[in-house]
UniProtKB/Swiss-Prot annotation:
Subcellular location: Cell outer membrane
The UniProt record lists the keyword Transmembrane: no
Family matches, as InterPro entries: OM_lipoprot_Borrelia, OM_lipoprot_dom_sf
Signal peptide: 1-16
Keywords linked to the UniProt accession: Cell outer membrane, Lipoprotein, Membrane, Palmitate, Plasmid, Signal
Lipid attachment site numbers (N-palmitoyl cysteine): 17
Membrane topology qualifier: Lipid-anchor
Pfam families, alphabetized: Lipoprotein_1
Effect in UniProt of substituting residue 236 to A: In strain: G2
Listed name of the protein: Outer surface protein B
Length: 295
C-alpha cells in the first residue's frame, strides 16, 4: 500500500514538473502567435481584399477600390501612406476625384486627394489641432512640390522638377518671398540667392564675373552675366535656345548652353576671329568647371 501511494505521489510530482516546465514555452508560444497575427494584419492592409480592386497610380502609389458601390452610391477607397491607413470614397472606380484620410498615432491627420484627370496627387498632413504641417503635390510629369509649415504659415518649399533638378526656398515670409533660395542643377551645380515678389534670383560668382539665373512666377528662365573688370570686360547675349554667348574685346569666346535635362555645356569659338565654334560642346561636370568657364 505504501509503495502504491509512493508511486501515485511520484506521478503527480512528474505531472506538476512537466506543467511548470511547459508554462514558459506556452507563454512564448502565445506571444509568437500574437506577433504573427499582428504581422499578418499589417501585411493584409497592404493587399486588396476579395471585395477590392487594386488601382496603380502614376507615382508608384496604389489604392484599393471596392468592387461595389456603398449605400450612398460611392466606391470605397483605401490606401497606405507612410504606414498610415487612409480611407475615403469616390464616384468612379478608378479613384479619380477621391479623397482619403487617416490618423497617425499622435492624432495628426493625413489626407490624400486625387485629381479628376488623375495627373495630380496631393498628400497633406495636419496636426491634432487641425493646423497644416506639410504637403506634397505629385505630378504625372514626375515633378514634386513639398511644403512645410510652422504655426500654420509656409516656412519652406522644395520643387523637384521632372528632370530631377531642384529649387528650394527657406525662411519664407509668404508664398512669394524667401530669404534663401538654392537651385541645384545636374552634377550638383548650385546657384544661390533669394525669392522676392515671386521672382527667384540665383547667382554664381567667380572673381569679377557674376552669372545670374532669374526665374519668374511662371517659371520662365533668363540668364545673364555681369563683369565688373576694368579691362577685357566680358559681355553676353542670351537667346531663346537657352544659349549664353560670352564675348570679350569684341569677339565671341564661348557658348554656355543650359539644356532642358539640367546639364550645362561649354563650347569655344576660334580665337582668331571669334566667329566659328570649334570642336564639340562638352558637359560641365562640377561647379569648379563652371567657374573656370566664366574666367
Amino acid at each position: 500500500m505504501k509503495q502504491y501511494l509512493l508511486g501515485f505521489t511520484l506521478v503527480f510530482a512528474l505531472i506538476a514538473c512537466a506543467q511548470k516546465g511547459a508554462n514558459p514555452e506556452q507563454k512564448g508560444g502565445d506571444a509568437d502567435v500574437l506577433n504573427t497575427s499582428k504581422t499578418e494584419k499589417y501585411l493584409n492592409k497592404n493587399l486588396p481584399s476579395e471585395a477590392e480592386d487594386l488601382v496603380s497610380l502614376f507615382n508608384d502609389s496604389e489604392i484599393f477600390v471596392s468592387k461595389e458601390k456603398n449605400k450612398d452610391g460611392k466606391y470605397v477607397l483605401r490606401a497606405i501612406v507612410d504606414t498610415v491607413e487612409l480611407k475615403g470614397v469616390a464616384d468612379k472606380n478608378d479613384g479619380s476625384e477621391g479623397k482619403l484620410e487617416g490618423l497617425k498615432p499622435d492624432n495628426s491627420k493625413v489626407t490624400m486627394s486625387i485629381s479628376k484627370d488623375q495627373n495630380t496627387i496631393t498628400i497633406e498632413t495636419r496636426d491634432s489641432s487641425n493646423t497644416k504641417v506639410a504637403s506634397k503635390v505629385f505630378k504625372k510629369d514626375g515633378s514634386l512640390t513639398e511644403e512645410s509649415y510652422k504655426a500654420g504659415q509656409l516656412d519652406s518649399k522644395k520643387l523637384t522638377r521632372s528632370n530631377k533638378t531642384t529649387l528650394e526656398y527657406s525662411d519664407m515670409t509668404n508664398a512669394e518671398n524667401a530669404t534663401t533660395a538654392i537651385e541645384t542643377l545636374k552634377n550638383g551645380i548650385e546657384f544661390k540667392g533669394s525669392l522676392v515678389g515671386g521672382k527667384a534670383t540665383l547667382q554664381i560668382v567667380e572673381s569679377t564675373v557674376t552669372l545670374t539665373r532669374e526665374i519668374d512666377k511662371d517659371g520662365k528662365l533668363k540668364i545673364y552675366l555681369k563683369d565688373t573688370a576694368s579691362s577685357s570686360k566680358k559681355t553676353v547675349s542670351w537667346n531663346d535656345t537657352d544659349t549664353l554667348t560670352i564675348s570679350a574685346e569684341g569677339k565671341k569666346t564661348k557658348d554656355l548652353v543650359f539644356l532642358t535635362d539640367g546639364t550645362i555645356t561649354v563650347q569655344n569659338y576660334d580665337s582668331a576671329s571669334g566667329t566659328t565654334l570649334e570642336g564639340t560642346a562638352t558637359e560641365i561636370k562640377n561647379l569648379e568647371a563652371l567657374k573656370t568657364a566664366l574666367k
